[in-house]
Amino acid sequence: MTWRAVAEKDFRDAIRSRWLFGATAFFVLFVGGATALFFGMLLPPDARDASNLFGFFANLGVFSLSFPGLLALILGFIGLSTSYGAIIDERESGSLKLMLSLPNSRRDVVVGKLLGRSAVVAVALLAGFLAAFVGFLATGTSVDYGAFVPHVALTVILGVAFVSIGLGISAAADSNREATLATLGLYLIFGILWSSIAEGIPKLINYVAEQAPFVSPLENLTRVKIGLFLKYVNPLKTYETLAAQVYYGAGQARLVSAAFGEQVALGPVFQEGMPFYFTGWFLMLVLLAWVVAPVALGYYVFEKRDL
């Protein structure tokens, strides 16, 4: 038995438990249903373009709303739910020791679990986008495949990233309760608290600088850049920005969901040239890092642990 066998078993287990069917049905109803409702009922025929939904962004100054952002928030929850118990549940039930005696290495287990759970999320997602495509055909909606296909690929990568995060937690946790609390806490941070933390860190640096002699506070532009960069460490924000880029271009994508102060400070900067740490390829590296780093750290802890 190898990592491939572990992945296949995990995928079959998802089918038997109906988790795959449940996730698939949800994404078909959500993505396909939103497409049918938006283009079949809400928009007139001459405004039926896929970007009007999948590239929808509304910035209200204080907060922003987007379809990619909503999809990412839901996908993050499903990706974490799919994977946070993958290893710790089998460890607590005793089946993990049996799996490791077949023989499998711990690396086989982690890699197999990652691939198996990622396949579950990817299949469910692709079914949802396929339903959207059927909706495009049924409603006569025009599609720019040069934007839509990369958007689908980015969404799958985000799903795998959250599977990796959940699996890393599962591999490192001491109990199912610990894994559950860590997963819920991290989801809360990603979904609600991250922006406030990112904006607060430069302010904290300035506060410390004001109290310390011979240390100058950050300039306003530098403070805004640091805050926005820290926001992009969040995979939800990174995905949302990359999704905006496939529809609007790099400069506008960085500002479409930015706060008013960020728009004022960074608009002229982005017109002159994009700093490398805000470029699309750099943000793509950040997103891919979320695919690799969490599961690698979880495996490191798991490998050292006495079962």
Predicted regions and their residues:
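Hydrophobic/aromatic residues in alpha-helical transmembrane segments
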Residues: 79-83, 131, 165, 194, ...
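Transmembrane helix boundary and interhelical loop/hinge segments in multi-pass membrane proteins
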Residues: 80-102, 114
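Long, hydrophobic alpha-helical segments
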Residues: 62-89
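Membrane-interface alpha-helices at helix entry/exit sites of multi-pass transporters
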Residues: 105-117
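A structural motif at transmembrane helix-loop-helix junctions in multipass membrane proteins
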Residues: 15-22, 67, 153-212
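Terminal transmembrane helical anchor/hairpin motif
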Residues: 41-43, 192-292, 296
